[in-house]
């Protein structure tokens, strides 16, 4: 039976976990789950159990980068050889070494474009080195993909230029949001308010921009 495999062994928290949940939920309820065998490679299946989805748990992937590299470039190849894989979708940036008729990768992390300064080395030395490393992690096998998936138009252009990828192969999957009624939008309260923005503490999230926008 033709198989769709979603690799997401590194997604355990924050927005990326929400994306994984939304994707698996939509896939489990779609007609595709009746046509294809769907297998999800995850860290822990307890929080993301949906019908019509099979799970393979790989908890070591999050513990050390060596495990992650082993899975992406060696172990996943063994898994792909066990099934007739129509689509292999990697939801966490790296393009694994696999056998599949169609391959796609969701590139959600903009770290390669982080313009770090000397002060950043003192504030978050680990992240600065991570940002420099991630550019090369993205590069491996990237041209083996049929499609790249990003969230924003500027990322489509930036990744296309950085890795010399035809931008027609890069899909912009914008986050879903409900339309705001124009009457509500124009009704601005003069009362004090509390602005609550839940997010993981990551330097590349540009919290300053969000705070400046609230002033407006």
Give residue ranges: language-model regions.
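Active-site donor-binding segments of glycosyltransferases and PAPS-dependent sulfotransferases
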Residues: 5, 19-26, 32-94
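Helix-loop-beta element that forms the nucleotide-linked donor phosphate-binding surface
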Residues: 144, 156-177
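A short, glycine/small-residue-rich beta-strand->loop->alpha-helix junction that serves as a flexible
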Residues: 7-22, 204-205
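Membrane-proximal helix-turn-helix segments that form the acceptor-binding/catalytic region
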Residues: 127-148
């Amino acid at each position: 039976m033709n198989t769709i495999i979603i690799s997401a062994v590194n997604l355990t928290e924050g927005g990326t976990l929400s994306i994984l949940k939304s994707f698996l939920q939509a896939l489990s309820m779609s007609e595709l789950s009746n046509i294809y065998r769907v297998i999800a490679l995850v860290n822990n299946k307890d929080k993301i159990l949906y019908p019509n989805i099979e799970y393979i748990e790989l908890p070591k992937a999050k513990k050390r980068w060596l495990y992650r590299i082993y899975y992406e470039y060696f172990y996943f190849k063994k898994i792909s050889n066990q099934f007739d894989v129509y689509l292999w979708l990697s939801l966490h940036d790296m393009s694994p070494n696999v056998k599949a008729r169609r391959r796609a990768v969701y590139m959600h992390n903009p770290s390669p474009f982080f313009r770090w300064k000397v002060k950043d080395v003192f504030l978050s030395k680990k992240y600065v080195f991570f940002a420099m490393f991630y550019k090369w992690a993205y590069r491996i096998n990237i041209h083996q993909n049929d499609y790249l998936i990003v969230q924003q138009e500027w990322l489509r252009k930036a990744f296309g230029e950085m890795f010399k990828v035809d931008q027609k192969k890069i899909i912009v999957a914008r986050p879903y949001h409900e339309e705001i009624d124009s009457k509500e939008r124009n009704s601005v309260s003069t009362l004090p308010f509390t602005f609550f923005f839940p997010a993981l503490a990551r330097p590349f999230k540009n919290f300053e921009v969000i705070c400046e926008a609230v002033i407006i």
